[in-house]
């Protein structure tokens, strides 16, 4: 039997790997699972991002669900977190999102959701895979085929976010925010949310267009160079950029400086933990020690997991976590949506900024300082075995290691992580330390150990 799902859902080139027939079968497999679990008329929420192939794949997936006797709520184009929120909001039995997140425009994918909006559990995912390949589908009688209805979730989703922040404090300061939604699903939410919060807003690339004509939807520093200049030139308080499905938010300060995701995650975590009087912060093995400092400051605990937003979300749910996130700008508010939410993150950052009375750059520069370096090596063959060899070498040399995900060598003032990519023939090396010199030294150590491991 083949393997369909990656860390969260399945992705590929639209109409080559992810075809209408493929989406139809996923819909039939998911619907069959829900029917076999004893639900008489399962209800499934389905939505998509702005990709050109989205409508085709959504309609095929819905057809598959209807054929098994599932009722479907089609929410159209919406951010992934809005669809996750809606799945929970409508008390649905499951959800499905047609998205390839930050991938280039020719890609698309499918994510399946639990009733609480979180990504499907591994054991249920395995059943969907088994049904997909065996084609042992439940086919409803002609008079038991599911019904389809359409719902607009954008307004209630925006209202739900507004209810979670201090709108009056924001209106009082009236921040000037420049927004780049990458022609993605966030185009329908973020500019409107910020205006309703009382911000002055200038938006760029904010019309839905699945060709992503303005930039690659991955909101990294390289792709945001032009946007960084716009934020500075307009004299904005800060800028915010999103990826294709709007589950992440990346920030630019008033000087046009790109802010690393773990710094904005730290700002949010600091506020949330303070409001909760402590709690549990969940993040990955690759995130900055800055988050440990923030947790300590607020009397909170830290749990570190493997890399992956769904892994963080599961850990938050299982351990009653307070706040979660990753170094790439993805923040999870578990009592709102059990997944990364770019709009909720932005609303919280706007509130923090408004209440502080400070410049955005000041909020960032007040955080404990760490230096980070990253590099990568193209490696064919069994990358996990090579990373395991790095662990063996490090242990022999007497280093303290953590093998939660890859090989992390831990020092008193920093760390280096050697980790195989789950999607590309690449091994990544990340380092961090309190000084630039040490961070470089740790990166060099990671490179040296990897080279030794590659020699065998």
Swiss-Prot record:
One of its GO terms (molecular function) is phosphoglucosamine mutase activity. The active site is at residue 101. CDD domains: PGM_like1. Can also use Ni(2+), Mn(2+) and Zn(2+), to a lesser extent. The modification Phosphoserine is found at residue 101. SUPFAM superfamilies: Phosphoglucomutase, C-terminal domain, Phosphoglucomutase, first 3 domains. Induction: Up-regulated in the presence of starch. Keywords: Isomerase, Magnesium, Metal-binding, Phosphoprotein. Mg(2+) binds at residues 101, 243, 245, 247. Optimum temperature is 90 degrees Celsius for PGM activity. Its cofactor is Mg(2+). Optimum pH is 7.0 for PGM activity. InterPro entries: A-D-PHexomutase_a/b/a-I, A-D-PHexomutase_a/b/a-I/II/III, A-D-PHexomutase_a/b/a-II, A-D-PHexomutase_a/b/a-III, A-D-PHexomutase_C, A-D-PHexomutase_C_sf, Alpha-D-phosphohexomutase_SF, GlmM_arc-type. One of its GO terms (biological process) is carbohydrate metabolic process. Activated by phosphorylation. It catalyses: alpha-D-glucose 1-phosphate = alpha-D-glucose 6-phosphate; alpha-D-mannose 1-phosphate = D-mannose 6-phosphate. The keyword Magnesium applies. Its EC number is 5.4.2.2, 5.4.2.8. It comes from the Archaea. Gene3D superfamilies: Alpha-D-Glucose-1,6-Bisphosphate, subunit A, domain 3, Alpha-D-phosphohexomutase, C-terminal domain. Homotetramer. Catalyzes the interconversion of glucose 1-phosphate and glucose 6-phosphate, and the interconversion of mannose 1-phosphate and mannose 6-phosphate. Also displays low activity with deoxyribose 1-phosphate and glucosamine 1-phosphate. Belongs to the phosphohexose mutase family. PANTHER family: PHOSPHOMANNOMUTASE. This is Phosphoglucomutase/phosphomannomutase. It comes from Thermococcus kodakarensis (strain ATCC BAA-918 / JCM 12380 / KOD1) (Pyrococcus kodakaraensis (strain KOD1)).
């Amino acid at each position: 039997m083949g393997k369909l799902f990656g860390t969260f859902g399945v992705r590929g080139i639209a109409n080559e790997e992810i075809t209408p027939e493929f989406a139809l079968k996923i819909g039939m497999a998911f619907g069959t699972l829900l029917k076999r679990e004893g639900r008489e008329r399962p209800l499934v929420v389905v939505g998509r991002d702005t990709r050109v192939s989205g409508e085709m794949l959504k309609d095929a997936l819905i057809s598959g669900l209807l054929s098994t006797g599932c009722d479907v709520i089609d929410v159209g184009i919406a951010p992934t977190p809005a669809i996750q929120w809606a799945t929970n909001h409508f008390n649905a039995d499951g959800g499905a999102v047609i998205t390839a997140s930050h991938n280039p425009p020719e890609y698309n994918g499918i994510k399946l959701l639990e009733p609480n909006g979180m990504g499907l559990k591994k054991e249920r995912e395995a059943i969907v895979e088994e049904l997909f390949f065996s084609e042992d589908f439940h086919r409803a009688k002609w008079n038991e085929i599911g019904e389809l209805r359409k719902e607009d979730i954008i307004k209630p989703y925006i209202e739900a976010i507004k209810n979670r922040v201090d709108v009056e404090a924001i209106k009082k300061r009236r921040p000037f925010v420049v927004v780049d939604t990458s022609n993605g699903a966030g185009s329908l939410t973020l500019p409107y949310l910020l205006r309703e919060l009382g911000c002055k807003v200038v938006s760029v690339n904010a019309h839905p267009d699945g060709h992503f004509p303005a930039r690659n939807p991955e909101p990294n520093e390289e792709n945001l160079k032009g946007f960084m200049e716009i934020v500075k030139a307009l004299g904005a308080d800060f800028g915010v950029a999103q990826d294709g499905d709007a589950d992440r938010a990346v920030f630019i300060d008033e000087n046009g400086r790109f802010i690393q995701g773990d710094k904005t995650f730290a700002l949010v975590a600091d506020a949330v933990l303070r409001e909760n009087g402590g709690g549990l912060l969940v993040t990955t093995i690759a995130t900055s020690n800055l988050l440990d400092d923030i947790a300590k400051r607020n009397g909170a605990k830290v749990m570190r997991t493997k890399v992956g937003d769904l892994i963080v979300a599961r850990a938050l749910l299982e351990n009653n976590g307070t706040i979660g996130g990753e170094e790439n700008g993805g923040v999870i508010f578990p009592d709102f949506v059990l997944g990364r939410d770019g709009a909720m993150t932005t609303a919280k950052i706007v509130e923090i900024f408004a209440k502080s009375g400070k410049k955005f750059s000041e909020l960032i520069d007040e955080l404990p300082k760490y230096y980070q370096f990253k590099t990568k090596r193209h490696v064919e063959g069994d990358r996990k075995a090579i990373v395991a060899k790095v662990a063996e070498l490090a242990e022999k040399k007497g280093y303290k290691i953590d093998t939660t995900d890859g090989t992390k060598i831990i020092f008193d003032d920093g760390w280096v992580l050697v980790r195989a990519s789950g999607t590309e023939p690449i091994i990544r090396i990340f380092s961090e330390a309190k000084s630039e010199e040490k961070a470089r030294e740790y990166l060099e150590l990671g490179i040296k150990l990897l080279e030794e491991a590659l020699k065998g």
